[in-house]
Amino acid sequence: MFKILLVCALAALVAANENAEVKELVNEVNPDGFKTVVSLSDGSASQASGDVHGNIDGVFEWVSPEGVHVRVAYKADENGYQPSSDLLPVAPPIPEAILKSLAWIEAHPSKE
């Protein structure tokens, strides 16, 4: 299922800009995993590699309409999809009062 999603994402990347030319296209499928690379003349690119256990590491990037270079690296494994990028939002730190409450709850477990 994930391979179908990956192929669709690559097709969408290629179709995103009709004027962009494919600079590099690699699709290797081996008994121990796969590797795919797509690079377009407009700066868009996608790379992914996976193993027989379903673990996938990859990166995709493009230049936004504002001229900002966007790059997202990801890992997909038994823990799910884990993207990382400077442009992704980051949760605020947990307030000190909540941390103290959690510590108190841990130190005083329910009697049930």
From Swiss-Prot:
The gene is Lcp3. PROSITE patterns: CHIT_BIND_RR_1, CHIT_BIND_RR_2. Keywords: Cuticle, Signal. Residues 1-16 form the signal peptide. It comes from Drosophila miranda. Residues 31-92 form the Chitin-binding type R&R domain. The keyword Metal-binding does not apply. Component of the larval cuticle. GO terms for molecular function: structural constituent of chitin-based larval cuticle. This is Larval cuticle protein III/IV.
